[in-house]
């Protein structure tokens, strides 16, 4: 269920990703602002302001990741929990969302984001087969115009447990660390 307690929501998943990157010496800014509270309306506009504030202060930022969970259910309302078993534990499957532009969205860097999405998914699948769902490639902005490495990640869905999502955050962070270090960034 939805919570504003940061140790019980997607902020906790972001904590896990940040922990893995920081352990490898990769600089991280993990903003824990709940942009969708108290209302989903305007959440992307509020998060765009936050991202821009950091980009103005730290123009060398190359990657921005927006951490979410999906909301998928059966036609009868049963919540779906996409999982993979990784090293004997249930992990919430991760879906990468990468937007594209039809010329109306001011997102000239979308091909860079898509390449990053494909490389990131390949790294996660090489390390943890079955962890990812197919990339969702769509005409949506979701603040992906901010950096050439801007993605939205869905950690499972509202049917998954927090523990499954947090474990996926750990695995995701390890794979992202490996990808960044392999590219010499």
Describe the residue ranges of each PLM region.
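Acidic/histidine-rich, surface-exposed loop or edge segments in extracytoplasmic proteins
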Residues: 1-3, 30-33, 92, 96-106
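Active-site-adjacent substrate-binding region
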Residues: 109-136
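Loop/turn elements at helix/coil->beta-strand transitions in domains of secreted/extracellular proteins
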Residues: 24-27, 59-63, 92-93, 130-131, ...
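Active-site microenvironments of hydrolase-like enzyme catalytic domains
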Residues: 51, 57-101
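Active-site-adjacent mobile loop/cap segments within catalytic or ligand-binding domains
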Residues: 132-185
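Structural recognition of the beta-strand scaffold that forms the well-ordered cores
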Residues: 28-30, 63-66, 95-97, 134, ...
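N-terminal catalytic or cofactor-binding beta/alpha core of small enzyme domains
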Residues: 1-62, 71-76, 170, 183
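Solvent-exposed loop/turn segments at secondary-structure junctions
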Residues: 34-38, 69-74, 101-104, 140-143, ...
């Amino acid at each position: 269920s939805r919570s504003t307690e940061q140790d019980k929501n997607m902020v906790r998943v972001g904590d896990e990703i940040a922990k893995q990157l920081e352990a490898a010496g990769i600089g991280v800014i993990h903003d824990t602002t709940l942009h969708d509270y108290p209302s989903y309306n305007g959440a992307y506009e509020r998060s765009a302001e936050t991202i821009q504030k950091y980009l103005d202060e730290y123009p060398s930022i190359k990657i921005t990741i927006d951490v979410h969970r999906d909301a998928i259910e059966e036609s009868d309302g049963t919540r779906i929990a996409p999982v993979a078993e990784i090293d004997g534990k249930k992990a919430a499957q991760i879906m990468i969302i990468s937007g594209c532009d039809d010329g109306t969205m001011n997102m000239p860097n979308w091909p860079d984001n898509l390449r990053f999405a494909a490389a990131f998914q390949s790294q996660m699948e090489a390390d943890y087969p079955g962890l990812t769902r197919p990339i969702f490639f769509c005409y949506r902005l979701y603040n992906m115009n901010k950096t050439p490495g801007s993605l939205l990640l869905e950690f499972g869905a509202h049917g998954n447990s927090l523990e499954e999502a947090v474990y996926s955050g750990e695995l995701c962070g390890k794979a992202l660390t490996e990808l960044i270090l392999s590219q010499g960034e």
